[in-house]
């Protein structure tokens, strides 16, 4: 027990130090204001319900039920990382991904992951779930030089995010996980495979029917 407490304390210090460092560079409120004041920032109510549901289903289906960190998913991911002796991105909530996007670079390290968690707690303390969702889709990268859902929606489909169909929504929701692989202009076959994963998740969590899914895929 003593060693476990020491280990937890060390992890806490590492995470807190990592987050404190980036906060000194630019405070949270300044970072958020910089993002939300952009001309093409898309509000939650200006997104297609299909798109919102697709993102939640594939990225973080318990988003509205857990806090900043989904400890169930994180524990599962950490176990896998230790077992496979490699660091993976698994277990991140949407809030943690926002924290990563606005505070940290894409470096894979334990200190960044822990700092990301501190950022996530700070975000959930100051912003609503819908506001955090907005931040996620407005800072995500969709490939082809498109940052944010406005650029992706117009770039790929020439329409506003509120007008995205289920087909388009399920395609775009799958891209940020690996834009260099899943962007529809990179490899349409892999993009369609990823889209099918999104639709399967939407079906599993009750967002669409089997017919909705087959209408898109056939």
Specify the residue positions occupied by each region the protein language model found:
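Juxtamembrane regions of bacterial inner-membrane/periplasmic proteins
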Residues: 1, 5-218
């Amino acid at each position: 027990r003593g060693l476990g407490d020491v280990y937890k304390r060390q992890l806490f210090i590492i995470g807190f130090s990592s987050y404190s460092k980036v906060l000194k560079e630019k405070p949270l409120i300044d970072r958020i204001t910089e993002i939300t004041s952009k001309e093409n920032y898309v509000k939650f109510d200006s997104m297609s319900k299909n798109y919102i549901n697709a993102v939640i289903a594939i990225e973080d289906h318990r988003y509205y039920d857990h806090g900043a960190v989904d400890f169930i998913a994180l524990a599962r991911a950490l176990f896998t990382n230790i077992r496979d002796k490699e660091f993976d991105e698994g277990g991140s909530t949407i809030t943690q991904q926002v924290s990563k996007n606005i505070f940290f670079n894409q470096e894979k390290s334990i200190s960044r992951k822990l700092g990301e968690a501190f950022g996530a707690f700070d975000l959930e303390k100051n912003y609503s779930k819908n506001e955090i969702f907005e931040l996620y889709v407005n800072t995500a990268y969709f490939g082809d030089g498109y940052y944010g859902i406005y650029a992706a929606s117009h770039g790929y489909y020439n329409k506003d995010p509120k007008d995205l169909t289920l087909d388009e929504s399920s395609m775009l929701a799958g891209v940020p996980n690996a834009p260099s692989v899943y962007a529809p202009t990179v490899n349409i076959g892999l993009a369609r495979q990823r889209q099918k994963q999104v639709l399967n998740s939407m079906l599993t969590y009750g967002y669409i029917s089997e017919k909705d899914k087959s209408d898109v895929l056939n």
